[in-house]
């Protein structure tokens, strides 16, 4: 086990796919890869509050954390914003909460909707992939990070999966290493799973949050007053990361019902995966035209 108790963090890795397995000491190679996250890192998430759940403690250790919010956090469906009067008002509340939360961790917020004509609404990222990828790639070229950190491809939310896809595309284009963290998904029996990879690779690094890091992370949680009910379902004391898995984005992440399908949202996992496939096909054609 590798630990720095003075900063409120304990790191451990697992040797196999058994979540109950005894933690191994993190190897020099594993920690060297993980250390890349502690320099200048761009964290690509879908919505304000994703970053606190997945990375609220880790970003406190980064030399220069920059968080890119890929959507404005406000869906078109009035169900989500009716208490705020309008979709725009709700989006502004979420933006201000994000600014306050990231100030606690010393991180810089970047709102991708400011860089895309017409913005990107919550639940719409998979429909705006060309615009989002272009804007995000430009930002990353300006920031020049040592690593990218994003959410897993796990079928919890179409925007989470799209943020993962965009990050992987940019990582491949730039050779910047990409790491991922889980938020939530459904198991085959339909039960919810929170902050756990649906398949372990043995490369996971678990961060146990303690002391001052925990105090700050809890303060960040409390900053997101509009998301209190959502955040109550997550554990602030654990964060888990690994190098990005080799996902096939042209297929849905799991063959069973995805979380947002069980929520009966308007999009399906097949539709989202098709959007990824269409984007990859279009960029391949564009590359061939440029080489011709």
Predicted regions and their residues:
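Short, well-ordered helical secondary-structure segments
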Residues: 31, 35, 145-150, 194-196, ...
């Amino acid at each position: 086990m590798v630990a720095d108790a003075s900063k409120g963090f304990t790191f451990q890795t697992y040797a196999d796919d058994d979540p109950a397995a005894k933690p191994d000491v993190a190897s020099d190679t594993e920690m060297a890869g993980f250390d890349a996250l502690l320099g200048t890192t761009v964290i690509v998430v879908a919505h304000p509050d994703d970053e606190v759940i997945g990375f609220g403690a880790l970003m406190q250790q980064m030399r220069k954390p920059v968080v890119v919010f890929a959507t404005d956090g406000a869906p078109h469906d009035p169900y989500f914003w009716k208490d705020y009067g309008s979709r725009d008002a709700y989006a502004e509340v979420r933006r201000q909460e994000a600014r306050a939360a990231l100030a606690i961790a010393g991180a810089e917020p970047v709102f991708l909707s400011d860089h895309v004509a017409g913005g990107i609404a919550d639940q719409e990222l998979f429909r705006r992939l060309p615009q989002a990828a272009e804007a995000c790639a430009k930002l990353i070229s300006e920031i020049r990070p040592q690593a990218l950190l994003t959410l897993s491809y796990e079928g919890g939310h179409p925007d989470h999966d799209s943020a993962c896809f965009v990050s992987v595309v940019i990582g491949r284009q730039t050779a910047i290493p990409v790491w991922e963290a889980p938020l939530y998904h459904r198991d085959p029996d339909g039960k919810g799973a929170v902050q756990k990879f649906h398949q372990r690779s043995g490369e996971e690094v678990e961060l146990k949050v303690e002391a001052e890091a925990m105090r700050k992370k809890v303060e960040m949680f409390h900053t997101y007053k509009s998301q209190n009910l959502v955040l109550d379902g997550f554990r602030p004391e654990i964060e888990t990361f690994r190098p990005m898995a080799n996902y096939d984005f042209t297929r849905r992440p799991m063959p069973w019902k995805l979380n947002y399908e069980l929520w009966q949202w308007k999009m399906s996992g097949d539709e989202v995966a098709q959007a990824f496939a269409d984007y990859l096909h279009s960029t391949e054609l564009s590359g061939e035209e440029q080489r011709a």
